[in-house]
Structure formats: C-alpha cells, structure tokens
C-alpha cells in the first residue's frame, strides 16, 4: 500500500501519484481503503511547499460508493493549499452525481482524463 502514494518523475517534473487500485485489487471496503491512502497522501503532500504539488489521482478500476466519497471530501479540502494542479484519471466508474458532489464540496475543479499521459501533459502545461 505504501507505493500507492509516491512521487514519480515526468519530463523532469515531480508528480505525486495516488493509485486507488494499486495492484489491481478490488477492495471490499472502499471507504477504509481511502482512509488508509489518505494518511499516506496527506503525510506526503503536507511535506511540500504550498502551491507546489502536481497531483495525479488514478481511479482506474476503483468503485466509489457514498461512504468512500464522504471519506474523500475532507481530503480534497485539506490538500488544496499544497496543490499547484491536480488531475484525475480513470474516473469512468465514479457516478456523475458523486463526482459533482466532490467538486461542489471542495470548491475546486477536478479535471478528468481518460489516460495518464493526457493528465500528465495537462499537469505540466502550466
């Protein structure tokens, strides 16, 4: 689980990668998995200067339910000061109403992309 949250390098830039389905395992309790990942993620992101983190959240294969979204909501607020940009990939399985709820609660855009390379290019396009 520790390598589900890690910095990668893309075209010479550091990007914080969060893989919800790291290893391709489908969790029996998505909310518990997100809580565990949240600790790792917040530990990583809060060590960085404000406004500096490029974040790629990979939801490929993840199944989010209402409980998982409730766990995710405060994380989207707590990480905000540290982020320069964030992008989500693999969100096809997140119901639109839950995605819109996350955007509304966090008061930020959550750009979605079909593939990682697209998301990474967008993160660096600033």
Residue ranges and their predicted role:
Residues 1-126:
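Amphipathic, Lys/Arg-enriched alpha-helical "gate/interface" segment within cytosolic domains
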């Amino acid at each position: 689980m520790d390598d589900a949250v890690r910095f990668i390098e893309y075209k010479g830039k550091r990007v914080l990668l969060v893989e919800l389905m790291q290893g391709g395992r489908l969790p029996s309790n998505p909310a518990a998995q997100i809580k565990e990942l949240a600790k790792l993620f917040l530990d990583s992101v809060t060590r960085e200067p404000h406004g500096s983190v490029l974040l790629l959240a990979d939801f490929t294969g993840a199944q989010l339910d209402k409980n998982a979204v409730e766990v995710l909501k405060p994380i989207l607020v707590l990480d905000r000061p540290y982020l320069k940009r964030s992008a989500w990939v693999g969100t096809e399985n997140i119901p639109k109403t839950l995605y819109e709820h996350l955007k509304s609660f966090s008061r930020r855009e959550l750009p979605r992309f079909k593939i990682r390379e697209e998301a990474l290019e967008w993160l660096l396009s600033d």
